[in-house]
């Protein structure tokens, strides 16, 4: 027991994110050398050129070849290699090199959700639901920890159509993964990338480590996210030991799956290196994926966009018509910690669904309360306060008083200590040999649908206090009975934003709102490798095929599934049109018609919590108008973040003759980027911005009228106030003028702009930072 409890404690510590850095400081480090867009049609020629460049900083060509890890020669140009700082600096001075940066390590951001989003499979409609009508022509690439191919989620159905002719990818074999057996018309691609990881952390010993040198998944994260995005329809799923049973499927169950294993197990979590990530993007672009889902990132401070493999890969994917979706990270609820903030990808926050698992707590046969848990069978024992077993009543490993709590259920409070993570209290209870745990904490910071190593019922502070007071008054040692849990749907107000979901504003580009959208990310039940314990802990010997997971990692594939449906239904839409459809049709009110609440507090959400709102797949199918982003928007963005004309021409796939940072750009900020949201990062005097919309609705002749919710202290004027369309794909521009009417020394205020024609409501959130007090005083 001591061995795996130590691992349990380690899991708590790694939640705080291990500091990135060079593991071996006395040896060369892996660097990425980025050269821009790929206009060479010959991959061999590009690789030869990369080796030629690398040879400039080595004494021989052989040394250069041994140093190189990857040559990126499909979707973009560049390479990764083992270099010392002097060699890296020398390469950075070459004219054709845009950036050179160290390969950092990224971390993973780790059912009922699709019913909650309105995409039920079992319904009384005569027409098939969208996910059964669209998607078979779409390939979704999952960048994660691999795949468990035997899962029913990835089986080939008899009615599956042939693999799309546009597919250029392949299945790569390896340990316990045979492409002829494990790949089919559902799982059509599987690759794995290990060079960057092993150069950074050392060679994996696969004889001792449970990992696989193949696309096969051990950590479970990749299997879970793939199942969420595109899992086939699986009826009568038993769920997690009987909880959450029903029909399981992904958002686009007909879509094809391509797996890119970029992340590997280290210290009980998934780690992905930038060299490997960029190689996966390069292959995904070549292979012909339509959507990429990547649930990883790293905490701020964020690297510049073109010193980040994820952002570079996403940029070139978007230029080639591939939609990319990232998770925002699990560093909330503090503001300004949102990750993956590039404007050419979609960033997803996490929210709850309306499913709960109520668990009765009965003390002495009469005193009854209800908590939340995943307990499959009834548990009975004596009830005790934490003060009986832990110094000061603080449920932590180091506070144990070496008294055993045999057949005892312990009551712990998060506020004592405090106990930052519930896993701390669970590890302490296991060390004391407790039977179970009742954990009292703020309801806004509880994750009820978590798989526990020791049975744990979550209650709020009020209920915890009532239990404590009962104990204090009881003349005898109380007996308590808990469980089993039940599955209840539709009685919980939802959605609310997860407390851990990383919030805006963006620390890298505050004039682009991030996150973009919110999707389910708490208690998501999806496929799981049966050889992997549900908690990943060595002492956990349970085997399951479906597991609950929480995190923005889980919300990300929800959006990827919706993107696949939209791409299939509207094959002529660009990635920016798909993003726009998702954002402008999002909603901001919960099932009780109140504003969505922000977990971690009791306040209503603002755009920094939820972006444009909560995803609404059915509405996104027909948004009416979309905001398209074009090359000149990206050029404007790059000019404003400091890139030169020549660098921009190298990065953009099809540069126009006007691809240059003219002086006229000096007064245009990224607020003019044709984004579905509007952010003014510093409003002092009157400011006017421009947006352009395209008519993609079913009616070519239509008229849209504008409605405005003004931010506090800001006058908002829009011209024109009416948009008249006479054909499909017709574009119209409008201008928005912001003028402060009150004086603030620095405050964010929020509003929205909505265009409606009676059938469609095209909504854009507005964020304004008012900072006019000092400016007016100095004037």
Curated annotation (Swiss-Prot):
The keyword Nuclease does not apply. Its EC number is 3.4.21.-. PROSITE patterns: SUBTILASE, SUBTILASE_SER. The gene is SBT3.18. Residues 1-21 form the signal peptide. GO terms for molecular function: serine-type endopeptidase activity. Belongs to the peptidase S8 family. GO terms for biological process: double fertilization forming a zygote and endosperm; proteolysis. Residues 113-621 form the Peptidase S8 domain. The active site is at residues 144, 221, 553. It comes from Arabidopsis thaliana (Mouse-ear cress). It is an enzyme of class 3 (hydrolase). Glycans are attached at residues 84, 236, 406. Residues 30-109 form the Inhibitor I9 domain. Pfam families: fn3_6, Inhibitor_I9, Peptidase_S8. Keywords: Autocatalytic cleavage, Glycoprotein, Hydrolase, Protease, Secreted, Serine protease, Signal, Zymogen. This is Subtilisin-like protease SBT3.18. SUPFAM superfamilies: Subtilisin-like.
């Amino acid at each position: 027991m001591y061995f795996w409890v130590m691992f349990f404690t380690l899991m708590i510590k790694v939640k705080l994110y291990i500091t990135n850095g060079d593991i071996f400081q006395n040896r060369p480090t892996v660097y990425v050398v980025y050269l821009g867009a790929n206009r060479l049609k010959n991959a061999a020629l590009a690789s030869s050129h990369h080796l030629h460049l690398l040879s400039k900083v080595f004494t021989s060509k052989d040394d250069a070849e041994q140093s190189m890890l990857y040559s990126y020669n499909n979707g973009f140009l560049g390479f990764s290699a083992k270099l010392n700082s002097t060699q890296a600096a020398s390469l950075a001075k070459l004219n054709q090199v845009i950036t050179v940066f160290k390969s950092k390590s990224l971390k993973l951001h780790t059912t009922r959700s699709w019913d909650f989003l309105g995409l039920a499979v079992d319904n009384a409609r005569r027409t098939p639901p969208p996910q059964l009508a669209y998607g078979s022509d779409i390939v979704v690439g999952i960048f994660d920890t691999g795949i468990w191919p035997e899962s029913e989620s990835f089986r080939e159905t008899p009615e599956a159509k042939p693999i799309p002719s546009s597919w250029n990818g392949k299945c790569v074999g390896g340990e316990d993964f045979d492409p002829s057996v494990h790949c089919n018309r559902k799982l059509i691609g599987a690759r794995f990338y290990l060079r960057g990881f092993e150069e950074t952390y050392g060679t994996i010993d696969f004889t001792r480590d449970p990992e696989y040198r193949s696309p096969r998944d051990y950590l479970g994260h990749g299997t879970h996210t793939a199942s969420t995005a595109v899992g086939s329809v699986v009826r009568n799923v038993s769920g997690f030991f009987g909880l959450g049973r029903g029909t399981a499927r992904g958002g686009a169950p007909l879509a094809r799956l391509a797996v890119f294993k970029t992340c590997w197990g280290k210290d009980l979590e998934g780690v992905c290196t930038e060299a490997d990530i960029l190689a996966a993007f390069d292959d995904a672009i070549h292979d012909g994926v339509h959507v990429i889902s990547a649930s990883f990132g790293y905490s701020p401070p964020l690297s510049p966009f073109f010193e980040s493999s994820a952002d570079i890969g996403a940029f070139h994917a978007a230029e080639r018509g591939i939609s990319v979706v990232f998770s925002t990270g699990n560093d909330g609820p503090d503001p300004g910690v949102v990750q993956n903030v590039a404007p050419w990808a979609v960033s997803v926050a996490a929210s709850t669904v309306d499913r709960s698992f109520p668990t009765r707590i009965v003390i002495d046969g009469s005193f009854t309360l209800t908590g939340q848990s995943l307990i499959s069978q009834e548990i009975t024992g004596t009830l005790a306060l934490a003060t009986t077993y832990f110094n000061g009543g603080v449920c932590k490993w180091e506070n144990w008083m070496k008294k055993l709590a045999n057949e005892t259920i312990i009551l712990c409070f998060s506020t004592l200590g405090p106990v930052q993570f519930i896993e701390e209290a669970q590890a302490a209870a296991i060390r004391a040999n407790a039977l179970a745990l009742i954990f009292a904490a703020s309801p806004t910071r509880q994750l009820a649908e978590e798989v526990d190593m020791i049975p744990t019922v979550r209650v709020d502070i009020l209920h915890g206090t009532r239990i404590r007071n009962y104990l204090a008054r009881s003349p005898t040692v109380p007996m308590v009975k808990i469980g089993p849990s039940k599955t209840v749907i539709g009685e919980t107000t939802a959605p609310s934003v997860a407390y851990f979901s990383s919030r805006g504003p963006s620390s890298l580009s505050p004039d682009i709102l991030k996150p973009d959208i919110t999707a389910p990310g708490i208690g998501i039940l999806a496929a799981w490798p049966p050889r992997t314990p549900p908690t990943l802990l060595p002492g956990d010997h349970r085997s399951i095929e479906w597991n609950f997971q929480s995190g923005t990692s889980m919300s990300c594939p929800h959006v990827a599934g919706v993107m696949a449906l939209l791409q299939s239904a509207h094959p002529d839409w660009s990635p920016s049109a798909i993003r726009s459809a998702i954002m402008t049709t999002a909603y901001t009110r919960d099932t009780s018609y109140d504003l969505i609440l922000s977990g971690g507090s009791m306040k209503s959400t603002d755009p920094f919590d939820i972006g444009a709102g909560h995803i609404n797949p059915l509405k996104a199918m027909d948004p009416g108008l979309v905001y398209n982003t074009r090359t000149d928007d990206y050029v404007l963005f790059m000019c404003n973040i400091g890139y030169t004309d020549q660098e921009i021409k190298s990065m953009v796939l099809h540069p126009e003759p006007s691809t240059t940072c003219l002086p006229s750009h000096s007064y245009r900020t990224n607020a003019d980027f044709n984004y579905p949201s509007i952010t003014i990062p510093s409003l002092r005097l009157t400011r006017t911005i421009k947006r352009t919309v395209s008519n993609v609705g079913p009616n070519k002749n239509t008229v849209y009228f504008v409605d405005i919710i003004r931010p506090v202290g800001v006058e908002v004027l829009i011209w024109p106030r009416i948009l008249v369309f006479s054909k499909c794909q017709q574009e119209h521009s409008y201008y928005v003028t912001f003028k402060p009417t009150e004086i603030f020394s620095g405050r964010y205020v929020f509003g929205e702009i909505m265009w409606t024609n009676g059938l469609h409501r095209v909504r854009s959130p507005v964020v304004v930072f008012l900072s006019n007090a000092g400016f007016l005083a100095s004037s």
